From Swiss-Prot:
NCBIfam families per UniProt: PRK11671.1 (NF008670)
GO CC term, one of those recorded: cell outer membrane
Secretion signal span: 1-16
E.C. code: 4.2.2.n1
A GO term, aspect molecular function: peptidoglycan lytic transglycosylase activity
Function description: Murein-degrading enzyme. May play a role in recycling of muropeptides during cell elongation and/or cell division.
Domain of life per record: Bacteria
Keywords recorded for this protein, A-Z: Cell outer membrane, Cell wall biogenesis/degradation, Lipoprotein, Lyase, Membrane, Palmitate, Signal
Reaction(s) this enzyme catalyzes, per UniProt: Exolytic cleavage of the (1->4)-beta-glycosidic linkage between N-acetylmuramic acid (MurNAc) and N-acetylglucosamine (GlcNAc) residues in peptidoglycan, from either the reducing or the non-reducing ends of the peptidoglycan chains, with concomitant formation of a 1,6-anhydrobond in the MurNAc residue
Enzyme category, top tier: lyase
Disulfide-linked positions: none
Membrane topology category: Lipid-anchor
Organism name: Edwardsiella ictaluri (strain 93-146)
Designated name of the protein: Membrane-bound lytic murein transglycosylase C
Length: 359
């Protein structure tokens, strides 16, 4: 089975923030999306040629994947399972190649806009506090901040944890590092102040923002999707991003570097939640019913939510207002045409309960 994390060369199909449809003025969007599809196709083909058909691995919403060394070496962080895998098919001194990749990964900074995940460029810059600081402990149980400790840990891994396997014509050398058990909480806490500012600015419950961030990206600031949704809240430039810019009186759409900035991404994603909450779905009177609709719309679009109840938007709102929140939830999780959106409401609603105690 192909080891593909985030490759699906299909244009989005629904208006949403993290989902799948061009806006009504979609010519620019389609052109941009087609360009991204071409880039992804070329990149995947390149990886397949180098690593083999069963070893295609590409960055996704919850997976950081960075290639180096002429694409012969890669670092993969699965932010959902909490596992780092660093591997190489280099034939000349693979241990030293792995050591350099281990150190680079452990010390990388937290600026996603500076890293090109679709090249083998050596563009990962260290910082005073690495992004993984506190999420990885070395063999002595200590967090890793500086080069000396990172190199010592790399040497330990190569001496004690080096693995070798064969795939096709390649021998793959690798090491695996486990993140600490509470790695998700540690990443979430990095963004709490940003979430609280956005919550206050737009009147959106911070527990909802956090639940969407966890569901969308597992708090991976490098997150990218097959439809080119970006960052922590998986914002799409030409749909949600454009709506937010219009609401702020700004021209155009947010750039990729803009959306890879964690604070700007959280601000944009939260502003879009506010648009859904107060404008597109603002006529829904019951706050719980409206929250269910907003969550589903963040994934699949407000139009698809309302069409469950009626093809007429005003009539759809009237029907929702005559229903209990439980009946609205049941309709959204059972009758929405997208299985992904049906699951999305279930996931976010359950996850939000875990964050309601955070203040």
């Amino acid at each position: 089975m192909k080891k593909v994390l985030a490759l699906a060369l299909i244009a989005p199909l629904l208006i949403s923030c993290s989902g799948k449809k061009p806006d009504s003025n979609g010519e620019e969007y389609i052109k941009d999306t087609n360009g991204f599809d071409i880039l992804m196709g070329q990149f995947a083909h390149n990886i397949e040629n180098i690593w083999g058909i069963n070893e295609v691995l590409i960055a996704g919403p919850k997976d950081y994947v960075k290639y180096s060394d002429r694409y012969l070496t890669r670092s993969h962080i699965n932010f959902e399972t909490g596992q780092i895998t660093i591997e190489t098919i280099a034939t000349l001194n693979p241990a030293e190649t792995l050591r350099q990749a281990i150190v680079t990964t452990l010390l990388m900074g937290d600026d996603p806009s500076s890293i090109d995940l679709y090249s083998d460029a050596n563009d990962i810059k260290p910082s005073r506090e690495p992004f993984l600081y506190g999420q990885v402990l070395d063999n002595t149980g200590q967090p890793i901040r500086w080069s000396g400790r990172a190199n010592s840990f790399a040497d330990y891994l190569l001496q004690n944890k080096l693995m070798k396997r064969t795939s096709g014509l390649h021998v793959i050398y690798s090491v695996t590092i486990q993140l600490v058990p509470n790695h998700l909480d540690k990443r979430a806490h990095k963004y709490l102040d940003m979430v609280r500012r956005a919550s206050e600015r737009y009147g959106v419950d911070e527990s909802l923002i956090l639940a969407i961030m966890q569901t969308e990206s597992s708090f991976n600031p490098y997150a990218v999707s097959r439809s080119d949704a970006l960052g922590l809240m998986q914002v799409m430039q030409h749909t949600a991003g454009k709506d937010v810019f219009v609401s702020k009186g700004k021209w155009g759409t947010p750039s990729r570097s803009y959306l890879f900035d964690p604070e700007k991404n959280i601000d944009t994603g939260t502003a879009y939640l506010a648009i859904l909450q107060n404008t597109y779905l603002g006529g829904i009177q019951n706050t719980t019913s409206r929250r269910y609709a907003v969550i589903t719309a963040y994934n699949g679009g407000a139009g698809s939510v309302l069409r469950i109840f009626s093809s007429d938007k005003g009539q759809a709102v009237n029907i929702i207002n005559q229903m209990s929140p439980g009946d609205v939830y049941e309709a959204l999780t059972q009758r929405h045409p997208s299985a992904e959106s049906r699951r999305y409401l279930y996931k976010v609603n359950n996850t939000q309960k875990n964050y309601r105690r955070i203040r």
